[in-house]
C-alpha cells in the first residue's frame, strides 16, 4: 500500500482516488503545542530554588518531602512547555488541502532547501491525510453520503477523536502522513531534507512528549533495519486506525520503545 501511495501521490494522485486540485495561501499561520508558559515555569523554578536554599540554611528537614513533591510537579511542566510551529500545509475535512507557500519559501530560504522538493514533500504529507480521511469515510459507509446522514456524522466524530482519544488520533494521523513524507524525501534523493524532518521532530519530542509528529521516529528506526518490516508496520497502523485510535497509538508507542 505504501509503495503505491509514494509512487503516485505527486505525479498521479487520481490513481489513488485523490483530487488533483488544492489551494495555496500566503498567510502565515502557527500551531501551538504544549500546556505551560515558559516564563511562568522559569519563575516557578527560581522560586523553588530559593526555597531549597532557605531550607538548607535552616536545616528544616521536615519540609523536604513537600519540596520534593513540588519539584516533581515542576519537572513535569518542563516537558510540556508551550511552543509554536509555523504551518506549511493543512488538510481540513470538507475543505481540502491548503499549502502555505510563503511559509514554505521562508523555511527554504532559512535552511537553504530546494523549494520544489520541500513544497512537494508538504503536499505528500497533506495528501496522505486526505487519503486517510477518505479511508475512514469508506470504513463507516460514508463515502458519497450526505453530510446530514448518520454514517457521515459517525465518520466525522471518529476522525477527530472522541474527547481523550483526540490527542491519540492526532499522533496516529501525523505519524502516517509524516513517515510517508520522510520516505518520499529519501526515495527522491532529498537526503538532507529527510534528515532535517526527522531531527526537527526529535528536538520537539524533548520539549513535549506528546508532540504528534514524534511518533514517526519509531517507523524511521524500523525502516533503517528493514524496509519490508517498516512497510508492514505502516499498513498495520493504517488498518488499526480505521477501527481504534487507541490500538493504533499503542502500536506506535511499541515501535518507539524498540527504536
Model region roles, listed by residue range:
Residues 104-105, 137, 184:
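Short, solvent-exposed loop/turn segments at secondary-structure junctions
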Residues 170-186:
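An active-site-proximal "capping" alpha-helix that borders the catalytic cofactor pocket
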Residues 183-259:
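Pan-zinc metallopeptidase signature
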Residues 1-115, 239, 243-250:
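A metal-dependent hydrolase signature that marks the N-terminal structural subdomain at the beginning
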Residues 109, 132-144, 188-194:
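Short, solvent-exposed secondary-structure capping/transition elements
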Residues 121-137, 178:
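Active-site recognition of the HExxH zinc-binding catalytic motif
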Residues 117, 133-174:
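Post-HEXXH active-site segment of zinc metalloproteases
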Amino acid at each position: 500500500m505504501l509503495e503505491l501511495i509514494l509512487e503516485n501521490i505527486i505525479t498521479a494522485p487520481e490513481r489513488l482516488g485523490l483530487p488533483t486540485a488544492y489551494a495555496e495561501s500566503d498567510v502565515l499561520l502557527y500551531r501551538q503545542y504544549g500546556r505551560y508558559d515558559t516564563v511562568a515555569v522559569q519563575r516557578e523554578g527560581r522560586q523553588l530554588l530559593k526555597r531549597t536554599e532557605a531550607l538548607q540554611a535552616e536545616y528544616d528537614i521536615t519540609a523536604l518531602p513537600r519540596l520534593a513533591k513540588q519539584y516533581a510537579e515542576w519537572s513535569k511542566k518542563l516537558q510540556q512547555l508551550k511552543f509554536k510551529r509555523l504551518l506549511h500545509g493543512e488538510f481540513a475535512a470538507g475543505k481540502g488541502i491548503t499549502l502555505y507557500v510563503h511559509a514554505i519559501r521562508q523555511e527554504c530560504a532559512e535552511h537553504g532547501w530546494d523549494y520544489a522538493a520541500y513544497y512537494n514533500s508538504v503536499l505528500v504529507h497533506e495528501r496522505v491525510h486526505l487519503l486517510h480521511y477518505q479511508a475512514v469515510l469508506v470504513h463507516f459507509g460514508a463515502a458519497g453520503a450526505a453530510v446530514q446522514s448518520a454514517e457521515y456524522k459517525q465518520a466525522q466524530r471518529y476522525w477527530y477523536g472522541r474527547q481523550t482519544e483526540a490527542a491519540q488520533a492526532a499522533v496516529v494521523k501525523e505519524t502516517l502522513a509524516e513517515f510517508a513524507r520522510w520516505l518520499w524525501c529519501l526515495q527522491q534523493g532529498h537526503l538532507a531534507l529527510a534528515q532535517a524532518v526527522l531531527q526537527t521532530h526529535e528536538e520537539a519530542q524533548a520539549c513535549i512528549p506528546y508532540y504528534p509528529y514524534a511518533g514517526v521516529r519509531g517507523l524511521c528506526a524500523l525502516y533503517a533495519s528493514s524496509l519490508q518490516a517498516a512497510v508492514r508496520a505502516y499498513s498495520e497502523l493504517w488498518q488499526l486506525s480505521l477501527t481504534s485510535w487507541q490500538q493504533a497509538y499503542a502500536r506506535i508507542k511499541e515501535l518507539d520503545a524498540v527504536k
